[in-house]
Amino acid sequence: MLHDSDNLVAESLVLMLSGTAQWELNTQKGLEMLYQQNKTLKSQFQQVDGSGLSRYSLASPRGLLETLDKIYETIGTSKIKTLLPQTNSEGTLIRFAPQQNLDFVYAKSGSLRNNHALAGYIFSKANKPYAFVISVNNYTGDKEAIQAAIGAQLSFLHKKLR
């Protein structure tokens, strides 16, 4: 599910989670269960469905970064590369900033009109993962220009990492 975005599957998982605590399948109950399981996160999310990015769901870059840190603590380095798509080669990131080689980035993207976000891990030359979130809001240019700028920042950062 993480390599190719599938909102139907994501929504179904939230509904199934709610069904483990009650007989009725209910999105809000499933989301409440997710919040209860992740009480250690300091940032709060406002989620209206299981699909993730929408005009009604709210998540801050800090909240996404906390989530990435928790994922790393839970599954470690080896599984990150199998779960998230690699930039420029698979999933929803297959055409992300194609003019740059970003094979050291494993992430998920989200975009709505005039908003673009990329969250995931950048791997150093020593194969150490660093969580990152880049969120660009209220831009009026085309998405490809934003992706190229994000790609340039990630390339710059990768050169600085050891």
What are these regions (language model features)?
Residues 11-14, 119, 128-138:
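Short, well-ordered beta-strand elements
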